[in-house]
């Protein structure tokens, strides 16, 4: 089963002066267990691609077209509430500058535990530990 399917994804940044085509017609499919490496020069759109799929770009500055499906879910068309049920539970990303996201003074397990508790507030400590370690 295809886990993530991205088809003809385009992301354009707009300002008053010009448009910048950051992601141009990208397509790929990923199955369960697949790994994907995205390689390119600084500023070539790698982070923009991930941020677009995860809907982390402001619609005021970025225009997204194309399709991104997680299983049967159209990531770019679903409501914000529906998407938030998937984010960090079923689909996530660790960006290249993870020090901006993850705290170096806290254990990674504790940080992942916090995210897990948001999605599974009734989970026991044992269940949480089994999931994050």
Tell me the role of every PLM-derived stretch:
Residues 1-133:
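ABC transporter nucleotide-binding domains
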């Amino acid at each position: 089963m295809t886990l993530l399917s991205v088809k003809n994804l385009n992301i354009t940044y707009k300002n008053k002066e010009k448009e910048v085509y950051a992601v141009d017609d990208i397509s790929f499919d990923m199955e369960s267990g697949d790994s994907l490496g995205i390689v390119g020069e600084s500023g070539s759109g790698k982070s923009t691609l991930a941020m677009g799929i995860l809907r982390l770009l402001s619609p005021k500055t970025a225009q997204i077209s194309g399709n991104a499906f997680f299983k049967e879910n159209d990531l770019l068309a679903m409501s914000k509430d529906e998407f938030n049920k998937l984010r960090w539970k079923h689909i996530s990303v660790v960006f290249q500058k993870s020090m901006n996201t993850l705290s170096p003074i806290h254990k990674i397990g504790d940080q992942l535990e916090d995210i897990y508790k948001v999605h599974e507030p009734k989970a026991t400590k044992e269940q949480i530990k089994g999931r994050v370690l």
